[in-house]
């Protein structure tokens, strides 16, 4: 894999979009201007809850990609990709006559944006096609790789997404170069607009590193050391060529992508077995990135004025490194060369720090990218980390003597890399999916549930008669289901992991209260399962929430059935990676008025972020907050935002009382971030509320929604809309039935 990032074309040191205010005037909307954002830069951004609208999808709402992709002749697809690999094009010649290493890097950098902290990034939607990723310094020259694949995409059309093709091409490239990959799953569906909801960092310049505080503490959830890089700076921290310091950055950033030390070492060693980097000349001769490039370049950026600008004259990262004498073949030569030499610091023709063998060792032993010339092997600072860091060194030294262990470790680490954001196994499609499952895949056993409609009705009665209250049942079902995050399709009620560690111990889940509810629900399950019919614990948690919502609706005068789809399985503690699942723990849950310690942004912003991870629309966000308040589902039974005198009843009282101008809101004397609502006429205290509650009256867009649900004719509509949104969250992880 080639590793690129310009030091970087100084001619393009600013993000290509620049400042939206030019020449003292606001830009036109078609120029990227957003007047509201300029006037009120901290305004809540509800647009992220309206992303990927059906109108933007040229394939139409009825197109079923999961069905279409499974009609592909995968053997023919392999042959078509293999043909592209060695069909060198004059406009961008293949290094060593093979585009394979370039495609590996393309796939790596598509998948490698994933971070486990919030599940965002990754290859799952083909985002490498769009800004900012298509113009990140670390993705220099990958625009060519995607264009080289266009004939394949053109042939297969809508049956093969760019998201799948980008990753498949890199995976199959290794198969053609003598490496046995672990497997491959299709199922990544393209999106048609850039992701505007991913926080890539605070910097305004490429390669900025304002994300650090203190003694190099990296801001969460970021998983790269500088703006525009995938992981680390290959020259070393901020260009400091110190392999041991670089190892610290490597461990931090790869760890934030859920990779352990062995997986990290395998990816670096295995990936750098292939290809080269590009730094043949002065990086100042490199033109603007794709988003800033002239119209006539048709989306191809980084045009170089050095020599021919391609082949042996190519400039990408500014590093000019060829690792091995067999750059298009899988073998153990990377480690043999890494350990077979002592290394001295040098600079590439572009002025970037890299390493070469001391005393002219291994001269003329590796091929040039083009022609018959020879040169010496080189290494990146981060490559030397694999030898000189004590932990990585112990691992790679073992692989030097046991290359078969490296091959196995790399195959599984690569498979994890390119599938980490694909979600549960029910989303893995195609004939190349391996039968073996791995711990990070959040395995869920087949459900034992076999209930019919009459059984469901009887179970609802039993749950409501168990002594559990509406707030207990609602909050427990919510805690289970709302652990889902749509970014990487992890979490949710399926698996019943609400009763397992780490979820059972999360502060937001109120462990003591939760343990009591679980004990009672398990008793109901045990009693019911003593007969011929069975229900899983995961299903029972969701069913209990449904029963409670139905009761609350009846108490409000509405006979509403909450749809329930059985079929959830129960995972075991042994099937649950505690460390990996710990990243799903919410730091805030505005739906239950929970705010953990150390929040970096105010609670109302955290609410929008959580709604986004749940794939909710603004109206769904509104009805869920309003409904959960009146149902009494708050954290620790708090009265904040419970704007009703009939809690436990599914009414629109939250909105009615929130927009009532007869109430005056002031900050609480306790100075704890809460507010007190008093009667304007009498001064009597009426309510208490949080920032999350008041934002539905203060923010103009959210108030517009609140007013709809506060109207006299909205009571039944509110109840029905709440149920629809509730079911959406309850079933968010049910990819097995949709």
UniProtKB/Swiss-Prot annotation:
GO biological process terms, semicolon-separated: cellular response to hydrogen peroxide; hydrogen peroxide catabolic process
Tryptophyl-tyrosyl-methioninium (Trp-Tyr) (with M-257) crosslink residues: 108-231
Post-translational modifications: Formation of the three residue Trp-Tyr-Met cross-link is important for the catalase, but not the peroxidase activity of the enzyme.
The protein's enzyme class: oxidoreductase
Chain residue numbers at which the record places covalent cross-link Tryptophyl-tyrosyl-methioninium (Tyr-Met) (with W-108): 231-257
Sample GO molecular function, one term: metal ion binding
Cofactor note: Binds 1 heme b (iron(II)-protoporphyrin IX) group per dimer.
Catalytic activity line of the entry: H2O2 + AH2 = A + 2 H2O; 2 H2O2 = O2 + 2 H2O
GO cellular component: cytosol
Cofactor(s) for this UniProt protein: heme b
Active site: 109 (proton acceptor)
Keyword set, alphabetical order: Heme, Hydrogen peroxide, Iron, Metal-binding, Oxidoreductase, Peroxidase
Binding site for heme b: 272
Alphabetized InterPro entries for the sequence: Catalase_peroxidase, Haem_peroxidase, Haem_peroxidase_sf, Peroxidases_AS, Peroxidases_heam-ligand_BS
Region (Disordered): 1-24
EC number in record: 1.11.1.21
CDD domains in alphabetical order: catalase_peroxidase_1, catalase_peroxidase_2
Superkingdom per UniProt: Bacteria
Function as written in the Swiss-Prot or TrEMBL entry: Bifunctional enzyme with both catalase and broad-spectrum peroxidase activity.
UniProt subunit comment: Homodimer or homotetramer.
PANTHER family: CATALASE-PEROXIDASE, HYDROPEROXIDASE I, BIFUNCTIONAL CATALASE-PEROXIDASE
Family: Belongs to the peroxidase family. Peroxidase/catalase subfamily.
Protein name (database record): Catalase-peroxidase
Protein's organism: Mycobacteroides abscessus (strain ATCC 19977 / DSM 44196 / CCUG 20993 / CIP 104536 / JCM 13569 / NCTC 13031 / TMC 1543 / L948)
Annotated gene: katG
């Amino acid at each position: 894999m080639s590793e690129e990032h310009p030091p970087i074309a100084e001619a393009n040191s600013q993000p290509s979009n620049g400042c939206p205010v030019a020449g003292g005037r606001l830009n036109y909307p078609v120029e990227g201007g957003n007047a509201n954002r300029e006037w009120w830069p901290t305004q809540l951004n509800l647009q992220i809850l309206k992303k990927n609208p059906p109108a933007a999808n040229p394939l139409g709402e009825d197109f079923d990609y999961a069905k279409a992709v499974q009609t592909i002749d995968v053997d023919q697809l392999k042959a078509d990709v293999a043909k592209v690999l060695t069909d060198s094009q004059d406009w961008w010649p293949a290094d060593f006559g093979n585009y394979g290493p370039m495609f590996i890097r393309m796939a790596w950098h598509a998948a490698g944006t994933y971070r486990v902290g919030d599940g965002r990034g990754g290859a799952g939607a083909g985002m490498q096609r769009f800004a900012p990723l298509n113009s990140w310094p670390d993705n220099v020259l990958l625009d060519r790789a995607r264009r080289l694949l266009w004939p394949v995409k053109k042939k297969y059309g809508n049956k093969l997404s760019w998201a799948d093709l980008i990753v498949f091409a890199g995976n199959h490239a290794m198969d053609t170069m003598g490496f046995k990959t672990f497997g491959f799953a299709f199922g990544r569906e393209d999106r048609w607009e850039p992701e505007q909801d991913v926080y890539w960092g605070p910097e305004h310049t490429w390669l900025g590193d304002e994300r650090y505080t203190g003694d190099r503490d990296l801001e969460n959830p970021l998983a790269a050391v500088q703006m525009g890089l995938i992981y680390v700076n290959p020259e070393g921290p901020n260009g400091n060529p110190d392999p041991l310091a670089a190892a610290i950055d490597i461990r931090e950033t790869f760890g934030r992508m859920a990779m352990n030390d062995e997986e990290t070492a395998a990816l670096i060693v295995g990936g750098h077995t292939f290809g080269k980097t590009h730094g043949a000349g002065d990086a100042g001769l490199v033109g603007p990135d794709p988003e800033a490039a002239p119209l006539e370049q048709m989306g191809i950026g980084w045009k170089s004025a050095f020599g021919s600008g391609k082949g042996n004259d190519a400039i990408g990262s500014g590093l000019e490194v060829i690792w091995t004498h067999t750059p298009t073949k899988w073998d153990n030569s990377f480690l043999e060369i890494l350990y077979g030499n002592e290394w001295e610091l040098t600079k590439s023709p572009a002025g970037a720090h890299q390493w070469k063998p001391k005393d002219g060792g291994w001269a003329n032993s590796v091929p040039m990218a083009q022609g018959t010339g020879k040169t010496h092997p080189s290494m990146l600072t981060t490559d030397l980390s694999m030898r000189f860091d004590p932990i990585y060194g112990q691992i790679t030294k073992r692989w030097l003597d046991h290359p078969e262990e490296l091959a196995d470790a790399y195959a599984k680490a690569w498979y994890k890399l390119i599938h980490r954001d694909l979600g549960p196994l029910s989303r893995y499609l195609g004939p190349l999916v391996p039968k073996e499952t791995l711990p990070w895949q959040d395995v869920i056993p087949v459900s034992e549930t076999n209930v019919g409609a009459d059984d469901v009705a009887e179970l609802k009665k039993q749950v409501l008669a168990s002594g559990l209250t509406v707030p207990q049942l609602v909050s427990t079902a919510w805690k289970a289901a709302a652990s889902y995050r749509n970014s990487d399709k992890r979490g949710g009620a399926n698996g019943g992991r609400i009763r397992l560690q780490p979820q059972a111990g999360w502060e937001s889940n109120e462990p003591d209260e939760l343990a009591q509810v679980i004990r009672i629900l398990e008793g109901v399950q045990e009693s019911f399962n003593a007969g011929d019919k069975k229900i899983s614990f995961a299903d029972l948690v969701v069913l209990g929430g449904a029963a409670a919502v139905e009761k609350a609706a009846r108490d409000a005068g509405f006979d509403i059935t909450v749809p329930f789809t059985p079929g959830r399985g129960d995972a075991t503690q042994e099937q649950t990676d505690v460390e990996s699942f710990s990243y799903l723990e919410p730091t805030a849950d505005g739906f239950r008025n929970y705010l953990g310690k150390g929040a970096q942004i105010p609670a109302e912003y955290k609410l929008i972020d959580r709604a986004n991870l749940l794939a909710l629309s603004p109206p769904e966000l509104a009805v869920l907050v309003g409904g959960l308040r009146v149902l009494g589902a708050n954290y620790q039974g708090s009265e904040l935002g419970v704007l009703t005198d009939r809690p436990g009843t599914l009414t629109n009282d939250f909105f009615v009382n929130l927009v009532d101008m007869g109430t005056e809101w002031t900050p609480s004397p306790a100075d704890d971030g809460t507010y007190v609502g008093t009667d304007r006429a009498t001064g009597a205290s009426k309510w208490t509320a949080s920032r999350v509650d008041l934002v539905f009256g203060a923010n103009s867009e959210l108030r517009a929604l609140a007013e709809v649900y506060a109207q006299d004719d909205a009571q039944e509509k509110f109840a029905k809309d709440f149920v629809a949104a509730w079911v959406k969250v309850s079933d968010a992880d049910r990819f097995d039935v949709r």
